[in-house]
Amino acid sequence: FLSEPGNAYKQCHKKGGHCFPKEKICIPPSSDFGKMDCRWRWKCCKKRSGK
């Protein structure tokens, strides 16, 4: 199964997040979703929205 370019991390993106290196701290009020479907030693962080 090959995903389309840019859609490699569907689970993370569905939650509105992006993959970051594991060392990055997700600063509140961002959410840290953990690894999700990001690559090894990365994690999914959702940056706070402007709403």
From Swiss-Prot:
Any one Pfam family match given in the protein's UniProt record, by short name: Myotoxins
Gene Ontology biological-process entries: envenomation resulting in occlusion of the pore of voltage-gated potassium channel in another organism
Species in which this protein is naturally found: Crotalus durissus terrificus
Disulfide-bond pairs as recorded: C12-C44, C19-C38, C26-C45
Residues spanning the signal sequence: 1-8
InterPro entries given in the database record: Myo_ane_neurotoxin_sf (IPR023355), Myotoxin (IPR000881)
Coiled coil regions, renumbered to chain: none
Entry protein name: Myotoxin-4
Tissue note: Expressed by the venom gland.
UniProt function note: Cationic peptide that possesses multiple functions. It acts as a cell-penetrating peptide (CPP), and as a potent voltage-gated potassium channel (Kv) inhibitor. It exhibits antimicrobial activities, hind limb paralysis, and severe muscle necrosis by a non-enzymatic mechanism.
UniProt keyword terms in alphabetical order: Antimicrobial, Disulfide bond, Ion channel impairing toxin, Myotoxin, Neurotoxin, Potassium channel impairing toxin, Secreted, Signal, Toxin, Voltage-gated potassium channel impairing toxin
Alphabetized PROSITE patterns for the sequence: MYOTOXINS_1, MYOTOXINS_2
GO cellular component: extracellular region
Main location: secreted
Phylogenetic classification of the source organism: Eukaryota, Metazoa, Chordata, Craniata, Vertebrata
Source superkingdom: Eukaryota
Record keyword Secreted present: yes
Signal keyword on record: yes
Localization of this protein: Secreted
Subunit and partners: Monomer.
GO molecular function annotation: potassium channel regulator activity; toxin activity
Similarity comment text for this entry: Belongs to the crotamine-myotoxin family.
